[in-house]
Amino acid sequence: MSNLINIKNRINVVTNTRKITNAMQLVSTSKLHRIINLTKNIKAYQNLVETTFDNIVSKITQEELNEIFPPKQETDATLYIIVTSDIGLCGSYNSNVINELKKVIKPSDLVITLGTKGLNWIRVSKFKDQLYKAYVNLEDKLDYSIATEIGNLNFELFAKNKISSCKIIYTKFVNNLIQEVSVKQLFPYDSSHLEIKKESEQMEGDIEFEPSAEIILQRAFPLYVSSMIYVLVSLSKVSELASRRVAMESATDNADEIINDLNLEYNSKRQSVITQEITEIVAGAQATN
């Protein structure tokens, strides 16, 4: 009888867990459907920002670009911005980002974390002294003011010779089932792809800049960095919801299988107990006769 009680308790525990995973799956699906409609607009905005900036950069030489943002000889430190979630139960979403950071981080680098999971990890890791700033309790859609603040921090650190570059590690949204960890350099601007664009005739025609491309670039670059942070973090949030939906769907399916197996085991043992009790009753009746 004690075995039956234990099995029944396990069924209740798994059933309660299934209710949680199923609820989180439904919530993630609802949020994903809502936010995925914004993805096209976000990607269109990203394409507009990148194309506009490419057009500006294409009008100046690499030497002029180096004069505006001179390469730092005093340090080779990189500021890494990592995008993680505030809550778990989203598969390997957070661990993939953290593992990517582990591959590339150097002792002189600095880290800005977005999301509670990234902060919790770095606080207990050997990289805890490299944490520069953390942002937690973010909404499904990043507040643009936070992106602007991070962009300004980047240029402050660069001006103080604390860093020579800035990169963001985020999760690229491919589709509902595929999300890929990516690293994008935000600063200095990587213009290596411009020649390829020119050869494929994707660049715009002649554009006149007033007062000059150099001055516009100098003023526009902080906007570019902030915009890219906003876009990439927003796309990461889509990936987070997709990862959580898949993880919770898998967990719910696994719970259903476990419940079915436990029910079969419970019914089998219960049948054995009943059969044994009937046998004992019959044997007792025969003994009295």
Curated annotation (Swiss-Prot):
Q: Which CDD domains match?
A: F1-ATPase_gamma (cd12151)
> Does the keyword Signal feature in the UniProt annotation?
no
- The source's domain of life comes to Bacteria
Q: Where in the cell is it found?
A: Cell membrane
Q: Which UniProt keywords apply?
A: ATP synthesis, Cell membrane, CF(1), Hydrogen ion transport, Ion transport, Membrane, Transport
Q: Which molecular function terms from Gene Ontology are attached?
A: ATP binding; proton-transporting ATP synthase activity, rotational mechanism
Pfam families in the cross-refs: ATP-synt (PF00231)
Give the CC-aspect GO terms.
Answer: plasma membrane; proton-transporting ATP synthase complex
Membrane recorded as keyword: yes
The way it spans or sits in the membrane comes to: Peripheral membrane protein
One GO biological process this protein is involved in is: proton motive force-driven plasma membrane ATP synthesis
- Check the record and name the InterPro entries matching this protein: ATP_synth_F1_ATPase_gsu, ATP_synth_F1_gsu, ATP_synth_F1_gsu_CS
Q: Which family does it belong to?
A: Belongs to the ATPase gamma chain family.
Subunit structure comment from the entry: F-type ATPases have 2 components, CF(1) - the catalytic core - and CF(0) - the membrane proton channel. CF(1) has five subunits: alpha(3), beta(3), gamma(1), delta(1), epsilon(1). CF(0) has three main subunits: a, b and c.
The entry's function note states: Produces ATP from ADP in the presence of a proton gradient across the membrane. The gamma chain is believed to be important in regulating ATPase activity and the flow of protons through the CF(0) complex.
Question: Cross-referenced HAMAP family, in alphabetical order?
Answer: ATP_synth_gamma_bact
Put simply, this protein is called ATP synthase gamma chain
Q: What is the lineage of its organism?
A: Bacteria, Bacillati, Mycoplasmatota, Mycoplasmoidales, Metamycoplasmataceae
As recorded in Swiss-Prot or TrEMBL, the protein's gene is named atpG
